[in-house]
From Swiss-Prot:
GO terms for cellular component: BLOC-1 complex; transport vesicle. It comes from the Eukaryota. Component of the biogenesis of lysosome-related organelles complex-1 (BLOC-1) composed of Blos1, Blos2, Blos3, Blos4, Dysb, Muted, Pldn and Snapin. It comes from Drosophila melanogaster (Fruit fly). PANTHER family: BIOGENESIS OF LYSOSOME-RELATED ORGANELLES COMPLEX 1 SUBUNIT 5 (PTHR31784:SF2). Belongs to the BLOC1S5 family. It holds the Pfam family Muted. The gene is Muted. Component of the biogenesis of lysosome-related organelles complex-1 (BLOC-1) involved in pigment granule biogenesis. This is Biogenesis of lysosome-related organelles complex 1 subunit 5. The lineage of its organism: Eukaryota, Metazoa, Ecdysozoa, Arthropoda, Hexapoda.
Length: 160
């Protein structure tokens, strides 16, 4: 009986540690927040890049139209602006292509996620095992108390 009480005491001592250990939950929330932030940010950045592409494209069209009608040094300046805008458009297109590339998580991050999932599964297994042990000990105690009570009734000749 003392052994069971000490086991229950040990389990009760571990309960606050198990209940108050929020690291797994907090890490999951941080990961979800970062993922949402990156997705939202990337969407807005891609939209801005498309707007820049449209603006640069329209400028290029306007510059090419102006350079066709221009004369003298103004035409040279427009030609130079046209090449610079073309380079800018190429840079924006390269940046868009780079933004579209799916980034995979690093192996270290994947290993950390796997380890976290394993720790969580182990924690849940241990928790379930602890619950079963406590429940079994309570059932055993109920049976012992019922036996003791029935023995006491027999000894005292009390009718049920």
């Amino acid at each position: 009986m003392k052994i069971m009480i000490s086991q229950v005491g040990r389990e009760l001592y571990k309960v606050p540690l198990r209940i108050l250990d929020h690291r797994v939950f907090v890490n999951g929330e941080i990961e979800a927040f970062l993922e949402n932030f990156e997705v939202r940010r990337n969407d807005s950045e891609v939209e801005k890049l498309f707007q820049v592409t449209e603006t640069v494209g329209s400028l290029k069209y306007d510059l090419s139209r102006c350079s066709a009608t221009g004369r003298g040094s103004g035409a040279e300046n427009l030609a130079q602006l046209d090449t610079e805008v073309s380079h800018l458009l190429d840079g924006v297109n390269a940046l868009l292509a780079k933004a579209k590339v799916e980034r995979t998580a690093s192996t270290q991050l994947q290993e950390a996620r796997l380890a976290r999932e394993q720790r969580r599964a182990e924690f849940l297994t241990n928790l379930e095992h602890g619950y079963r042990r406590i429940e079994n000990s309570f059932e055993e105690k109920e049976e012992e108390i019922a036996e003791l009570y029935s023995d006491l009734q027999l000894k005292l000749n009390i009718a049920k």
